[in-house]
């Protein structure tokens, strides 16, 4: 498995790789290749981590390069992968390579490698660019990374188009994303399998509220309904839409807003009252924030299938989000959450006000949300379906190779 992010878990892709790997059956050998992260390797100076917390013994981790969130570090990791991954694959007699949508295998040719490659499509440059162009017309608060995506979008989009070809096989985490790949990239539908990401509903659970109160006593003392925004402080996440909605909410009812996530606070005008700003939080913190919150809000302009929504639903939060990407596949509007149009601060304010004022509605929505996650989103099942897809791909690849070699 090739991934730009892994341990320590700081994003949805890293968590996806972790959960799929550790939920495979015991006889599946998994070798994860990822950039080096010094905090993880402090006690492992050889750069190879055979086991780590939460990893079973059949999972090995090799660190190549250094972790970073920048485009140029992504390119560096692609170069490193092109040099070392074929060697690792031959030495360990790898049956299949599973890559992620940051395209770490961009410079590796599946036909030359003679090993099938499956890529999970989490997001696309094109999708980001379209959302940011729309946001830029009504907002001047784009983050530096968002401005870079707008600037380089056309170039990166061409690189992306060269990657998404019928030489590879694909997993998408939503039906919406599968259709995007068919329509925009011309990928054969038979080469795409939809396998949803999931949530660990034992970790993300309202039963952890006492732990949460001990961890955040100042939030536990807040009596007003608590509204959590836990995501990157970025325009494409609808941050400025939320900030425009908050004054309208507070003019009608009482509520307390909690902001947590990566990004610089000064880039956005925070409300003058009724809020707590936590900034970037460690990976063990989100379950406590969900458990303490009544409402979760993610007013994104572009998403695929955001894990944070499932985590909030598992925690019995009433979720308010937008009708973009795969989100409508996750939420049944009015039953286990609320869906609104993107970039609509008035609709957002109305929905937040209604939920803040109606405790019974919040509770019913949260209960149905957790039931939905438990019934539909199980990591063990997702890992099993992923393994089944691997087996199908390997069988197809072997058949085509035998036909080619005659």
Outline where the language-model segments fall.
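Conserved donor-binding/catalytic core segment of Leloir-type glycosyltransferases
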Residues: 219-237, 243-247
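Aromatic "clamp/platform" in nucleotide-sugar-dependent glycosyltransferases that forms part
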Residues: 282, 301
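Short alpha-helical donor nucleotide-sugar binding micro-motif in glycosyltransferases
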Residues: 281, 288-293
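Conserved acidic donor-binding segment of nucleotide-sugar-dependent glycosyltransferases
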Residues: 333-334, 338-345, 354-359
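Carbohydrate-associated surface elements
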Residues: 176, 198
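A short helix/loop element that forms part of the nucleotide-sugar donor recognition site in Leloir-type
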Residues: 47-49, 205-220
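Membrane-proximal helix-turn-helix segments that form the acceptor-binding/catalytic region
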Residues: 142-170
């Amino acid at each position: 498995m090739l991934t730009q992010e892994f341990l320590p878990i700081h994003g949805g892709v890293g968590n996806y790789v972790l959960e799929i790997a550790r939920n495979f059956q015991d006889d599946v050998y998994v070798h994860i290749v990822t950039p080096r992260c010094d905090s993880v390797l402090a006690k492992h100076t050889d750069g190879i981590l055979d086991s780590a917390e939460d990893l079973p013994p059949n999972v090995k981790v090799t660190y190549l390069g250094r972790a970073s969130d920048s485009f140029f570090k992504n390119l560096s990791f692609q170069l490193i992968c092109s040099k070392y991954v074929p060697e690792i694959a031959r030495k360990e007699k790898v049956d299949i390579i599973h890559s992620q949508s940051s395209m770490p295998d961009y410079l590796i040719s599946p036909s030359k490698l003679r090993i099938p490659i499956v890529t999970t499509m989490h997001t696309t440059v094109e999708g980001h660019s379209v959302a940011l162009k729309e946001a830029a017309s009504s907002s001047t608060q784009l983050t530096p990374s968002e401005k870079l995506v707008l600037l380089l979008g056309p170039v990166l989009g061409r690189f992306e188009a060269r990657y998404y070809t019928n030489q590879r096989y694909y997993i998408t985490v939503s039906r919406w994303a599968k259709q995007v790949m068919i329509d925009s990239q011309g990928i054969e539908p038979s080469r795409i399998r939809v396998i949803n990401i999931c949530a660990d509903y034992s970790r993300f659970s309202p039963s952890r509220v006492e732990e949460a109160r001990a961890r955040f006593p100042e939030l536990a003392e807040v009596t007003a309904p608590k509204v959590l925004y836990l995501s990157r402080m970025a325009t494409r996440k609808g941050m400025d839409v939320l900030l425009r909605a908050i004054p309208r909410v507070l003019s009608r009812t009482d509520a307390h807003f909690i902001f947590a996530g990566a990004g610089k606070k000064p880039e956005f005008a925070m409300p003058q009252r009724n809020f707590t700003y936590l900034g970037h939080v460690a990976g063990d913190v989100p379950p406590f924030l969900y458990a303490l919150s009544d409402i979760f809000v993610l007013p994104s302009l572009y998403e695929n299938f955001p894990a944070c929504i499932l985590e909030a639903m598992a925690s019995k939060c009433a979720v308010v989000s937008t009708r973009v990407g795969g989100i409508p596949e996750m939420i049944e509007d009015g039953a286990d959450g609320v869906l609104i149009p993107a970039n609509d601060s008035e609709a957002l304010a109305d929905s937040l006000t209604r939920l803040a004022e109606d405790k019974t509605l919040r509770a019913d929505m949260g209960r149905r949300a957790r039931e939905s996650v438990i019934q539909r989103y199980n990591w063990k099942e997702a890992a099993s379906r992923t393994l089944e897809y691997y087996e199908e791909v390997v069988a197809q690849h072997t058949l085509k190779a035998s036909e080619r070699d005659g």
